[in-house]
Amino acid sequence: MRTVLRALGACLLCILAVATGCRFGGAVGAAGIGARSGKLEVSEQAVRLLAQVARQPRLTLAMAGDCMFDRGVRAICDERGREWLLSAVRDTLRAADVAFLNLETSIARGGARLPGKGIWFRSAPEFAQELANAGVDVVTLANNHVLDYDDPAFAETLSNLAQTGIAVCGGGRNMADARRPAVLSANGISVAFLGYSEFAHIYWSAARPKRFVAGEASPGISCWDREAIIEDIRRAKRLADHVVVSF
């Protein structure tokens, strides 16, 4: 595919040169493409190349930022219904082959607030299904709110997402899980998703110095670590055609 794309780039440059030549009434010829007397002439070779490129599989990504369903958002949902919340973007998300966003909340009923944070997000489990119904395929958990209600709510979040079929990156039952890419495929093209947060090592209260970063045997999110990220990207490139990294 890369060879075809490079050839397409050369072909487009030739067409641009042709257009420039036509504009000034000149004659330009390159790689079988020429312009004479203001008339565009395309060789059979160029036509075959363009047809080959047109037959290449394509994948459409829809990507969104922070998403949560608590506080004021929850109040609106209580008034208008959960289905209303994503109605304006549902068609766009569903039309994409893969839809990705940052889940800036736990999706759970359990857990207890971590002291000292000041702002806590926890969304009802039903919203996991709302995301799936809206066409969301994969989320990153690498942020500073997914563990607001501690490990029990985080574990419940992982379970609720798994039940709806939404893939996860950037967080997991341990560091290996958190760094493992979520790989999705459509139209014969695979994409690996990775997520990281610079807030993973922060804690908000000395009374409960809970960091969000995952450990070898403890749940959490993946942190910003340049060498680890490079290693993860290299590993992901062996698993998929393309890699998407979220910070």
Which sequence ranges carry the predicted segments?
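Bacterial N-terminal signal peptides that target proteins for export
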Residues: 1-9
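Residues marking helix boundaries in flexible regions
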Residues: 4-5, 16, 34, 234
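Bacterial N-terminal signal peptides
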Residues: 9-19
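Acidic, metal/ion-coordinating pockets
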Residues: 22-247
